[in-house]
Amino acid sequence: METKSVEEFLDYFEKVRGRTRRVVDCIPRERIDWTYREGKFTFADLVRHLAATERYMFAENAVRRPSRYPGHGRELAEGYDEVIQFMERMHAESLELFRTLGDDDLQLKCTTPGGAEITVWKWLRSMIEHEAHHRGQIYMMLSLIDVRTPPLYGLTSEDVLERSQR
């Protein structure tokens, strides 16, 4: 799916982010630093990682600047409220940068942190895929601690099965 309009992309991205926020909002405050295994991402690490890569990697590269990814450590934001605020702030800053792009800029090349040249619209699409990947991790981690989560698109698989013709 090629993206030819910045506004179209931003509209879609806001919908994707809304779905991500709904699941992030399910993280229990007291479990923000929980992980399923030592050395693996905590909930806070995942949220900080999504926020920092969006702002300092994807947005910077999209406007044809080098990545400035600072990692996902506690020094960026610690505790539930700070982590959520960090995500909101990084998203707002990213949107400001994305809005500086014109539709023609989507066809330009940018350089990824790995040194690959990629068309800007493809780079932005990979940001969406990256977010969906980590959203899936959050869903799985929440299921491991028995937290009920919202269906991604309004229906569960059981709802779809029930409403399907057989």
Segments predicted by a language model, with ranges:
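Acidic catalytic patch
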Residues: F98-G114
